[in-house]
Design a protein with these regions (language model features):
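Glycine-rich phosphate/diphosphate-binding loop of Rossmann-like nucleotide-binding domains
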Residues: 83-95, 179-233
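Secondary-structure transition/hinge residues
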Residues: 14, 18, 60-64, 181
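Phosphate/diphosphate ligand-binding glycine-rich loop within oxidoreductases
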Residues: 67, 71-178
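Alpha-helical scaffold segments in soluble metabolic enzymes
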Residues: 5-12, 51-58, 126, 147, ...
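Phosphate-binding loop/pocket of nucleotide- and phosphate-handling active sites
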Residues: 2-23
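Thr-Gly-centered strand-to-loop micro-motif
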Residues: 40, 158-159, 192-193
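Positively charged, low-complexity intrinsically disordered leader regions
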Residues: 24-91, 95
Length: 233
C-alpha cells in the first residue's frame, strides 16, 4: 500500500514539472480537428467528428488499391503500446501506420519491463526519451491515456482504457453507419448488452448522439450505468 502511494506521489510530481513540452506534430489549420491527442469521444464536437469521417472516406478507396503505400507519415515514429490483449485494434493501427509510411514499434505487456515490476511512469519516460511522434495506448486502467498525454511530448491516441472509452472504435462504427445510411440525423440506434462496463458503448453513445442519432440502450438493469440519461440516451 505504501509503495502504491509512493507511485501516485511520484506521478503527481512528474505531472507538475512536465508542463513545458513541445509536440512534433503541427496543427493543420485546414482541418476542423486541431488537437494534439485523441483520448475521449465526449470531448469531440460535431465538426471534429465529421472531419475524421471525411478524411477516413479517402482511405476506403486507398485500401482498395493494388499498391497500398503512402509517404504521409514518412519519418514519423509510432509506438503501439498494448497492455491488454488485442487483435483487431492493434493490427488495424499497425497496418494503417505502415501503409502511411511510418516507422512502427509494437510493445506488448509481456515484452515490456512493466512485466518485471517497472512502473508505467518509468516506461513512458524511457519511451519519451526516444522522441516518438505518436503513442497508441491500450490499457486496463481508466483515464491512463490522459495521464500519459501529460508526461510525454508525443501525440496520444486512446485505443481503449478500461471501461472508460474507445474513441477510434466509435469513429469506425460511425463511418460504417454513414456508408450504409448516408446520414445520422433521425436514425434510431439500439446498443445492447453490458453497457456499464463497455468502453465501446460509451464512446458510441457520445459520438452518435453528437451526430444527431437517437440512442437507446437495452440490457439488465444491473448492467446499465446509473447516469445513463446524462449521456444523452
Amino acid at each position: 500500500k505504501i509503495l502504491e502511494e509512493a507511485k501516485k506521489i511520484a506521478l503527481d510530481l512528474y505531472l507538475k514539472i512536465s508542463n513545458n513540452k513541445t509536440h512534433s506534430f503541427k496543427i493543420n489549420k485546414n482541418y476542423a480537428y486541431r488537437k494534439i491527442h485523441l483520448i475521449e469521444s465526449k470531448k469531440l464536437n460535431k465538426k471534429e467528428i465529421e472531419c475524421f469521417l471525411k478524411e477516413s472516406e479517402k482511405y476506403i478507396k486507398f485500401n482498395k488499391k493494388t499498391l497500398k503505400k503512402s509517404n504521409l507519415l514518412k519519418g514519423r515514429t509510432i509506438f503501439n503500446l498494448f497492455f491488454e490483449d488485442s487483435t483487431r485494434t492493434r493490427t488495424s493501427f499497425e497496418v494503417a501506420a505502415k501503409r502511411l509510411g511510418a516507422d512502427l514499434i509494437n510493445v506488448a505487456l509481456k515484452d515490456s519491463s512493466i512485466n518485471k515490476g517497472e512502473t508505467l511512469l518509468d516506461t513512458m519516460t524511457t519511451i519519451n526519451s526516444m522522441s516518438p511522434d505518436v503513442l497508441i495506448v491500450r490499457h486496463p486502467e481508466e483515464g491512463i491515456s490522459n495521464k500519459i498525454s501529460k508526461i510525454v511530448n508525443a501525440s496520444v491516441i486512446n485505443a481503449g482504457d478500461g471501461s472508460h472509452e474507445h474513441p477510434t472504435q466509435a469513429l469506425l462504427d460511425a463511418l460504417t453507419i454513414k456508408k450504409k445510411f448516408g446520414k445520422f440525423k433521425g436514425l434510431k440506434i439500439a446498443i445492447c448488452g453490458d453497457i456499464k462496463h463497455s468502453r465501446v458503448a460509451r464512446s458510441n453513445i457520445e459520438i452518435l448522439s453528437t451526430l444527431g442519432c437517437s440512442i437507446n440502450v437495452i440490457g439488465p438493469k444491473s448492467l446499465i450505468p446509473k447516469d445513463i440519461q446524462k449521456m444523452g440516451v
